[in-house]
């Protein structure tokens, strides 16, 4: 198998990897084409399937090439090298491998590795969240012949299934705009790039997609045991890698749950009168569950989250981030301190870096995307200002959009409050960016169709 000594960054992609990659890509695309052929007879939405898989795989290859030849390594390579040491340990001594992946990281367990297996990077080994990524990658490396390129592509392919499930779910609710929704969920350039490598973000975005899909299936009453299982696994991945994502998801989930029940009530007085009750119950249950998960959430627990955000924000704007820092101002880790910075943080999370803040090609691409999102949001904002009632009616009559909107707002504030570095920001936005763009598209289409109907009615008069 292809071997590289640990603690030496990969300088190039070996020809062996390209040969194995060709085989895997042909195999994956062959299976995708066969699956699309079977499914498209039942549902025309599968016309996007092969194209989505191909673009996802191509994005992974581009990610690897850019990180090896442009960035000369990075966290993605460190994840790979740490996972490779686990894979070697799995092959050499499966008992010690089970010990390492099931027990806490200790110095004693660290020395279960040796020169024949290579050693995991210490800063990843002793961080449970980063080491979890390496644990997930170890079996993938085994079937990828321990190739960085091939294992990245396989992970990217696996993550695509969650994106596809969410795409089909949203299209089922909002038919007729599948092409536009495919741009948001399957073909958004920054989401494809940052969600196609060996990074936390690839796994967490896929977990978010599976979470929303399973929650919707649970509410719809379709195979609830399977939905609960998927929901549990997705939540476990989020808690294990980035717990604050679950914190952003949970309040909207509770609102969606209660709102879906109330929306079935036919009497408008009862239905709209219950709205304050919905939000109160969502807050109480959400706060209670997140508090109960305190130990699992660690530094992102309810009582420590604000302090964590403040400390992280101050760190990410230090000089050693080489000029890519920005500053929304320091804030106290209190409710009042967060409330004062929430609007600025939300703008950061949703729309920055602005195009004039780009310092390299990758940042420029993100800036161009953000400019489009900003213009779309401004067009929608104008409609909201001139008729706020219609906007809130749209949200309350569409629990899925209400959920995605609340998740986008909460997550953008969390990211904006805890990030002061554009390099980190473009990656941290991934778990909510595509969902936020979906919200913009659905709301924009709602107003566009409303205007078209109004013009048609005026013409008929």
Regions found by a protein language model. Name each.
Residues 7-9, 111-154, 353-358:
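Juxtamembrane segments of multi-pass membrane glycosylation machinery
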Residues 28-33, 345, 349-355, 366-394:
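Hydrophobic, aromatic-rich transmembrane alpha-helices
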Residues 31-37, 139, 150-173, 375-379:
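Transmembrane-helix motifs of polytopic, lipid-linked glycan transferases
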Residues 37-39, 172, 222-226, 379-406:
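Membrane-interface helix-loop-helix junctions at transmembrane boundaries of multi-pass membrane enzymes
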Residues 67-82, 91-114, 124-136, 342, ...:
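Extracytoplasmic catalytic/substrate-binding loops of multi-pass membrane glycan-assembly enzymes
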Residues 192-193, 214, 219, 227-249:
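Membrane-interface alpha helices of multi-pass inner-membrane proteins
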Residues 197-200:
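Short acidic/glycine- and proline-prone juxtamembrane loop motifs at membrane-interface regions
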Residues 236-369:
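Alpha-helical transmembrane segments and terminal signal-anchor/GPI-anchor hydrophobic tails
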């Amino acid at each position: 198998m292809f071997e590289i000594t640990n603690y030496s960054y990969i300088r190039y992609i070996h020809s062996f990897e390209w040969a194995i990659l060709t085989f895997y890509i042909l195999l994956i695309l062959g299976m995708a084409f066969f699956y699309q052929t079977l499914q498209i007879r039942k549902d025309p939405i599968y016309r996007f399937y092969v194209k989505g898989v191909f673009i996802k795989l191509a994005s992974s290859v581009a990610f690897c090439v850019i990180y090896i030849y442009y960035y000369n390594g990075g966290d993605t390579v460190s994840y790979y090298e740490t996972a490779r040491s686990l894979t070697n340990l799995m092959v050499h001594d499966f008992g010690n491998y089970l010990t390492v992946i099931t027990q806490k990281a200790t110095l004693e367990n660290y020395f279960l590795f040796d020169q024949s297996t290579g050693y995991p990077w210490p800063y990843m080994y002793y961080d449970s969240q980063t080491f979890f990524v390496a644990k997930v990658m170890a079996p993938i490396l085994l079937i990828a012949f321990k190739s960085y390129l091939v294992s990245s592509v396989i992970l990217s392919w696996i993550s695509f299934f969650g994106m596809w499930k969410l795409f089909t779910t949203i299209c089922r609710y909002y038919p007729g705009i599948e092409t536009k929704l495919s741009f948001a969920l399957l073909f958004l350039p920054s989401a494809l790039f940052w969600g196609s490598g060996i990074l936390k973000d690839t796994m967490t975005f896929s977990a978010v997609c599976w979470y929303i899909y399973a929650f919707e299936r649970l509410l719809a009453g379709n195979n609830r045991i399977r939905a609960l299982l998927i929901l549990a696994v997705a939540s476990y991945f989020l808690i294990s890698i980035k717990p604050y994502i679950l914190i952003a998801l949970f309040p909207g989930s509770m609102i969606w749950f209660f709102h879906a029940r109330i929306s079935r009530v036919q009497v408008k007085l009862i239905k709209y009168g219950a709205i304050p009750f919905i939000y109160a119950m969502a807050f109480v249950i959400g706060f209670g569950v997140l508090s109960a998960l305190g130990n699992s959430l660690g530094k992102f627990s309810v009582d420590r989250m604000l302090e964590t955000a403040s400390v992280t924000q101050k760190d990410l704007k230090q000089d050693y981030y080489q000029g890519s820092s920005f500053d929304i101002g320091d804030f106290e880790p209190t409710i009042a301190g967060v409330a004062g910075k929430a609007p600025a943080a939300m703008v950061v999370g949703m729309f920055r870096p602005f195009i004039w803040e780009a310092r390299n090609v990758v940042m420029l691409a993100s800036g161009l995307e953000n400019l489009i999102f900003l213009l779309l949001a401004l067009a929608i904002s104008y409609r909201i200002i001139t008729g706020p009632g219609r906007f809130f009616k749209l949200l309350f009559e569409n629990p899925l959009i209400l959920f995605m909107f609340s998740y986008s707002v909460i997550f953008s504030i969390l990211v904006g409050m805890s990030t002061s570095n554009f390099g980190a920001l473009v990656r941290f936005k991934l778990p909510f960016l595509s969902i936020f763009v979906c919200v913009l598209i659905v709301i924009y289409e709602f107003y566009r169709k409303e205007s078209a109907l109004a013009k048609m009615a005026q013409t008929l008069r």
